């Protein structure tokens, strides 16, 4: 082929430039199918170039390369060739982020079965394959079949670079007999794993074989692979539609889609992972065909069949639909995954000036602009090139690249509309970036420059890591947990004061008037008010950005307009955005984060607003308003007024107790904090782009500041260690919270005793290092990304029992003795015979620890006793009394629920996938605290299947006779005032999930296992507090607002996501959570056997139990192993039952959990008598049982719901 022939090809390649911009139209060929061109557009009856080439079965002979043709040798191609390309749409949903496990999965897929080889052997095989691929690229020369011209055509028309095309051709030749064509027999036997499903196999082949000649040419194969693994979401949805359309009638039915999902689900288990992320096949089908609301609140009706347009519309609601429920993952793993791993460590950041083409502007011209582009940290940052001024600190556009697609575009002679362009662009090369509604051409003078930018953008577009999250799994992160608002607010205030550059804050509710520190007098408390701290930092030059939910729901008033005006009036460096402006009316922004200098992030369930400050005392009264001033004294079961004067009380403090607020938050330091900042930047910029009223707000970009904010204010850990050792261990308590409660008449010291908290900060590297040296299994041998949450960690009970036995003997004997001493028979009357009030329960373990100190092999601090590092009892006790931070040892990933309305991106439901995956793979126990527990065991509503995952895991434990425990803690009334029909409906949905309605967890288990005592497996709990004040005794539920999942003390999920469809489906409320495992391992017992757990999730779980059970430090050892009969039955369940019995006897039907029907008047207090005080003093902690029969005699969905109430007209999904 000579130059004129090549130029003719280029002219034909893009002679119809409108195909890049037109609206696609459906055409039906003879068999009823739509004809799709290889660029992903619908055909208009004209055959594509590839179709013509395939029909003629003619590939032109390579000609001698002309000197004028740009150099395409191996070295040059390698520079712009294959890079890590992990796009949101290319990485399989089921893959782990562990490279070895990923290679095992690829090896299984290539062999077509589960390999018996070890991971080490497969690692060696994979390494050899990588070397072979690199050698192939180095020595590759064009041949008679795969010519340079065909290479050019494919690289321009697909999402693959030249090197990738060569490697794909190498793989294709191993499958096909002829080299360029694959027969139907080869396709069925070697390419697809669905040979047993004839309909699916034929449909898939028809989708790839565009000309219908029953053969697949290499160009057809590459184009289909390009769409499946790297195409736009619309392209992949169209391809999915064709695969599911078995009969070619341009409609897909429930049966067709179900057959597809079922076949894929079956084949996945064949290759060694049955960890199905798509749920039950019926769930996937229901998500497409059932009725419901879109992300913008548009109602979709139930459908039996879907057209292409309907399929595309509903595809926006399901993040798995564009993956063809995993089929595209299969092709990615089989053909692309190994290529992506070749350059997995290569990072590409770029800067340069390009010409941007904005299509179809005024007068139907394509307008060109010169732009400066910067590519870094997953963002494409566009700066305007101004004639007199160029300020790179003010970008004109910032594009969050994960989820985007980029494609090389080559042009020939310009059309009439482009003749105004410079002549150097008449034969142009460039690329097109597509992300959501953003669609732009960028032009360059040569191909190599275009390919460099394309490869770099593809690298930064990577997404879809574990749980299909936007965030990578990152190691060596410092994470700190906070139980309740007081400790979190205090740390937040100190961190904000150390900010040097930027402060990001987002929340469901942000109040300028919340006091963050309340322990050091009125003057310091006033200084700690949020608006004053932010103003102080703004005056220092720190930029403050606050993103609030604009309460579009008329039933909720948070005063966001006043908060915006107030904060922006404090200083010009404070910027506030309220989003969205008008719709959706049904959904909300629910993320609760603060980010300091893009280096430190706070993530969890606590908003920075009124009524969230709480201590571990769970104080009910504050007559003088010293700790809870004005509207900070609140009770959700009454009429809450969140707007107006914040200093004005909304309740009579003598008549109404406050409702304590129980929550959990985290502090993250390290690269994962950058992921939280990226999430904020994406949402902030999206709010600017979609709302014209925000156009004057600054656009944010990711920045890499050097040096963490100063940490001088933090207490010295060694000083704490010296002080605590001198005083002895008996005073040491869990966590960092300082004493905050002043004693008053009427306080119950038995209930309040658990509030004494110190700071036993045994966190130093010296101590940890010396301890690690004494362990037989150093955590250094752990793979930095091999966390429990990757699902492939083997059962350590069997693998490590032998090697840990010697180390564990002494500790095991001591633990068994403690358990024997505290096992007491239980009866229904609260007494010293059960729970934590047993006289035999307490032990003097700490005194024994002090007495057991030895002098040999110890370390010494000046003025302190020597600590024996070989004494297991001492070390284990210290571990469980350590602080709430794990420094530089955590494996962290951010997960979220996000969608087009909330962030301008495709639907992401990685929170949901994390919950499903972790629950399904739990080995010993599941611990959940959540505001809501609204889920389904298989019914159409709710749509999320977290309850089903729990049900199936308990089923498996019962069938296999495993000792397995599940604890689920929710509030008694999660939605506030029961006078509202919406609040009653939410309780109704909760009860349907747990114990009522016929399809609940407990009902299904009882029907299936009638002879099994379910109390041995699952416990539903709430928490409640009482307090005497003057001549009255108050009681109130503690509002469980935390969103925590802990599995096996090895992994924890903490964030803002509730267990309901609103939070989990991804297409509704915006959410953010952190998945944490810890490489710092602690050796404990699990069911009495040696078991290694992560320090962070273990200490968090123990800290929560200590708070709920009111444990002293000497009693902690009894809950270290959470699944023994002693911990779960004798302590947890019996304490909850004893406390519930006392509350019922003292308060009767005055409290919600004792009411079986609606309409019974509640009372917040009863007259105080000495007898009642004595009886209530037997309550241990705050734990109670969740009332399974609450309102069982009332229909919460219809009773007291009139035709004039809003609940009668809104869609039921609002409540689920």
Swiss-Prot record:
Known regulation of activity: Inhibited by butan-1-ol.
Compartments (UniProt record): Cytoplasmic vesicle; Cytoplasm, Cell cortex
GO cellular component: cell cortex; cytoplasmic vesicle; filamentous actin; membrane; protein-containing complex; pseudopodium; vacuole; vesicle
Catalysed reaction equations from the record: a 1,2-diacyl-sn-glycero-3-phosphocholine + H2O = a 1,2-diacyl-sn-glycero-3-phosphate + choline + H(+)
Top-level EC class as recorded in UniProt: hydrolase
Ranges of residues in domain PLD phosphodiesterase: 585-612, 1036-1063
Function: Plays a role in cell growth. Hydrolyzes membrane phospholipids, such as PtdCho (phosphatidylcholine), producing the free headgroup and PtdOH (phosphatidic acid; signaling molecule on its own). Involved in the inhibition of actin-based motility and endocytosis. Its inhibition causes complete collapse of F-actin organization. Plays an important role in cell migration by localizing along the anterior cell membrane. Overexpression leads to the inability to aggregate even at higher cell density. Also known as a negative regulator of quorum sensing.
Protein name per the record: Phospholipase D B
Gene: pldB
